[in-house]
C-alpha cells in the first residue's frame, strides 16, 4: 500500500475511532449498548451513501469509507457486548437490532445516495 493511501486511511480511522469513543459514553450497564449500536448504524448508513458518490479506491473513498466508517464501526465490541449481556433476552434483542438495523441503514444509505446524486 502506498504511503499516501495508508495515511488517508489512518487519518480517517482515527477520526472514526474518536467518534465511536465519544458515542460509547452513552452505553450504560442497565440498557442496550446504545452508543455502540448508534456508531454501527451511522457507519452503515454513511457507507451506503458513500458507495453511491465515491469511486472505490479513490483517496476520498479510502479516507471516508475504509478510514472513518471503518474506525467508527466495531464488530469486536458488538460481540463482546453480546457475550457480556446479563440476559439471553437482552443479548438477542441487541443482536437482532444491530444486524437488522445495520442492513436497513445500508440499504437506506445506498438509496439516498442514488436519489441525491450518483
Which role does the model predict for each range below?
Residues 1-118:
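Membrane-interface helix-loop junctions in multi-pass transporters/channels
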Amino acid at each position: 500500500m502506498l504511503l499516501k493511501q495508508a495515511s488517508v486511511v489512518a487519518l480517517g480511522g482515527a477520526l472514526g475511532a474518536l467518534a465511536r469513543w465519544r458515542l460509547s459514553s452513552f452505553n450504560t450497564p442497565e440498557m442496550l449498548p446504545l452508543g455502540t449500536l448508534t456508531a454501527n448504524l451511522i457507519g452503515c448508513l454513511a457507507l451506503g451513501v458513500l458507495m453511491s458518490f465515491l469511486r472505490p479506491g479513490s483517496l476520498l473513498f479510502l479516507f471516508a469509507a475504509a478510514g472513518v466508517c471503518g474506525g467508527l464501526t466495531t464488530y469486536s465490541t458488538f460481540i463482546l457486548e453480546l457475550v457480556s449481556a446479563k440476559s439471553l433476552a437482552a443479548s438477542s434483542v441487541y443482536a437482532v437490532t444491530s444486524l437488522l438495523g445495520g442492513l436497513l441503514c445500508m440499504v437506506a444509505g445506498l438509496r439516498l445516495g442514488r436519489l441525491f446524486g450518483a
